[in-house]
Structure formats: C-alpha cells, structure tokens
Amino acid sequence: MYKKYLLLLACGLILTGCGGGGESESTFDSNTSTSGNGNGNGNGNGNGNGNGNGNGNGNGNGNGKYLVVPKDYDKPDGDKVRIYYTIHPATSSKQRIGILLLNFGGPGATAADRLLSKVSSMPTSITESFDIVAMDPRGAGKSAFARELMTCAVGGSCDSTYKEISPYMGSNAVIQDMDSLREHLNEDQINYLGYSYGTRLGALYAERYPTKIRALVLDSSMSPLHQNYEELRIDQAQGHQKIAEYRLDSKPKSMAKLDDIVTQTKDSDYTANDGGTIKKDDVNLILGAIKHPMREYLNNLRGISWSESKLGLSLSALFDKDEAKPFICWRTQCETESNSLSFSHIPKESFTSDEKRSSAMFRSVMCTDERATLDDSDIEGNEDKYLASSSIYGYYLKENLSGLCKGWTAQRSPIASQSEIKNNITEQVLIVGGLYDPQTSYNWSVEMKDTINNAALITIADTVGHGFSYNGIGSCLDDIVTNYLLEPEVKVTDRKCERVKRISYRYSNEAPTVPVNSAHSGDIHL
C-alpha cells in the first residue's frame, strides 16, 4: 500500500506521528472495547469502571486515568471504549481558571506521555492558572484501537481493521471525546492549545461546541479549505518551494538549477561539470534536507546561517558552480555531521511497531475525515496539479506521498466545512503560523484566519520550523499566547515575531539533542 518513501515521510510531515508512545504492546489497554453497561478495567496502579454514560474513569500508570465513552456516539447505549488522559493540576487554587487541553498533533501520536515535558516549558502564570490536560486520541497510546492498529500494521495489512474501527476514530469522534472529558471534569468550558493536526481538532471542536470554548490557540494551523488528502499534499508543494527560495536566498539561478536537476533525475542521473553524479535518491535527500526544520536549529546552535553550513555550502557549489562532489562528500558524512542528530531522508530499512501503528492511524484518520472523495483514477492522474503547485516539489510529493486514500473502502465521517466553521465560531481565536513551515504551510494559517470571523494571526517570520508556542521562539510569541489564554476577551492584533538569536537545547556530552517537549522533534506528522 505504501510507496517507497510513504511510511517515512508520513511519519515526518505532521506534528507528532510515528511514535510518541512506547514500542511495547504492554503499554496498551488489553480491552479497548466493552459492551453492555460499559464496564472496563483500568490497568497500571488502579482500576476503574464506566457506567455507560461516559463518565467513568480509572487510574492508570502514574497520573493517568481512563474515561469510558461510547464507541459510536450515535449509539450512546452501545459498546464502550476507553480514552486515556493525564492531568497536571493547577499549582494555585486561588489563581485557577479552568482546564487547558493540549494536543501536539498527528494524527498518529500520543499526547498523555508528553504532558509533563510540555508543562516544564510553560510560564508559571499558566501552570498556576490551569489544570493542564492531555488525552491520547483513539488509536494512540493507551486509548481505544491502538492495539488493533498496531497488530494490523505489523502484520502488513489493515484493510479489514479499517472497516471495523475507522468510522469510530476520525476527528469527529475525537472532538466528541474531548467534550465528554470536559463534562467528566465538571468544566463549563475548555481552553485549548493545539499544534498542527491539533488545530483541526480545535477548530472542529469550536465549530460543534461554540459555547464550550473559552480560549482557542491554533498553532501551525491546518487549512479549513482542504476537502481531501490529495488537496492537502498538492497545496503543500508550493509551501515547500517557498522554503527552498528562502534557503537559497531567492537566487533565481540557484532555483532554476535545482529545477533542472529535479526534472532530469526523474528519468536519468545528472552528471555535473566536475564528474559527480546526482541520482534520484540524492534529489529526494536534497529536497528533504532543504525543508527539514531541524537544520535551522542545529545551525542556530552553531551560530551559523544556512548558507554557511556544510550542506548549504555543498548545495551552493552544486547550483552555482555545477559541482556535485562537495554534496556527495557531505552526503557520505551526513550521519555523523550532527553527532546524535540524523537528517537523512533516505528510506529506513525498518520501522518500529509503534511507527507502523502511527502510520496506519495517520491513514485511518486522514481518509475518514475527507469531505470530497476522489476516485482512484482521479488520484492516479493528478500529477499536473502537483506540478502546477510546484515544479520542484510537486513531483517529489506526488511520487512519495500521493495515494494515501487510494483504494479506501471503509466508511467515512466527513468533517465540518469551511462555511460551517466560519458561521459557528464567534469568540476570538489566536492563530500562530510560520512563514516557512514545512509541515503546515503558512497559507493554511492565513486561510484559517480568514475563515474565522474574529481571529488574530501571529506570524513567525524568520525560521524554518513547525509548532512554535512555548518552544523556544521567544517572549514575543510566548507572551502573546500567555496573555490571550489568561484573558481571551482582550483584543489581539496581527503581528510578526522573530525567533531569539540562539535557541538553547539540552546537551549530552556536549552534543545537541532535541528537547522532548519540542514540536520540532523527529516525530512530526502535520
């Protein structure tokens, strides 16, 4: 089902995915679906019961708990499933405002096991004021359907499993779980901070439950315009091209050379003037590395610009002097260039069980959510649309990521349309978008801002990155997000923020490592 690069790139193109929970199946609930009165046993340090109305819970490992909810919300008295969540209580009962629900993106990743790390990056005013909550969505972590997805993904075929569970694990089901959790916690409203795919969940929740949302932050937003997966990827190509233009300092000759190399290597190798040979896999590596956000952060640590990095210099030689050997030299050393950090986009030979589960979940949710479905023939024949979006990245995305929903036969649960979001969300919403975001293109944040009648857009202008709030961009952004969460009724205006000059990451033996609370860690989906 997956093309050569599909599993790898699907795991790297949306904020979290292909991991996030443990790889051991023992971390999953052994009984994710119950029937009758909804009774189900919790695991870990405690047991819990559900009573059919979705308001039961049991303590799991650590601070985790289970919420019992309907498998199918259209049949509230039918089978029940359990949703795992964790809470970091507000540290000041006097300052407490309510709950702040976090979603780090996906679809495919956990959330509960990342909560404490994220809390550590938040200011005291937020941790004092909110019970901070993270919920593993259906299909991930310790929540329902995670075991089923892992089993079928490891076995190599999920078609029959998709037919059984996908109708009950799309975004519509998740936002209903979110509201069940709100009710269970006896809260009138929620505050929400969602990254990447989490912005889809936040917007859909606010559309369906407009009176139940107090504050809504959509960081690295998905677009409300995309009606299916192919539209998303086609649109993403032009966002990637903008990043290439930014990386190459908007040099027309460099962009033209890159375009020529991409075109030639579709059918044959490219031989440069110095005798070096560039193959199609090399081009995939180049295109992936140009848009990879961690390049930016590693360079920041070293105090150098993109053009001063080894990769930047080797590509300058290739594009400006038609010399391929510097890039070939870089390619052979790229695994050690950054010590513990690898940026190779060469397909992995193997994936962990949880990476496979995550990729299967990604397909399940993205295809279930589609509003306008495409015939297989339409998907196969859409290369011209990819190339119209970007002559450089169009073929790259078409070859490696198109066709995710080809052959999909499971029942869908279409998400709300742009007009429904526009008509039903009335409270002020804060949107954060990166001008050079490789996962959720900047125009998607603009489209979300234009859709919501009362919204402000904070633009991160000078970095290739994804997921920005409380992730090291600096006080310009974090203060805006914090003040909005504390007082969402205060009007926020559009503005630009720039990252701090140098981002400090944790170090181990003086080698930079990715902070586990970072939205830029290697487990990025949308």
Tell what function each PLM region has.
Residues L15-G17:
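C-terminal motif of bacterial Sec signal peptides marking the signal peptidase cleavage site
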Residues L258-N423, N517, I524-H525:
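Alpha/beta-hydrolase fold active-site neighborhood
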Residues V464-S475:
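Catalytic histidine-centered segment of alpha/beta-hydrolase-like enzymes
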Residues I425, I431-G433:
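Short beta-strand/loop motif that positions the catalytic acidic residue
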Residues A206-D260:
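A catalytic-pocket lid/entrance helix-loop region that shapes and gates access to the active site
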Residues G20-C152, S254-Q264, T409-S413, A456, ...:
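Catalytic-loop region of hydrolases
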Residues V174-I190:
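Conserved acidic catalytic loop of the alpha/beta-hydrolase fold
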Residues P438-N443:
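Conserved alpha/beta-hydrolase "acid-adjacent" motif
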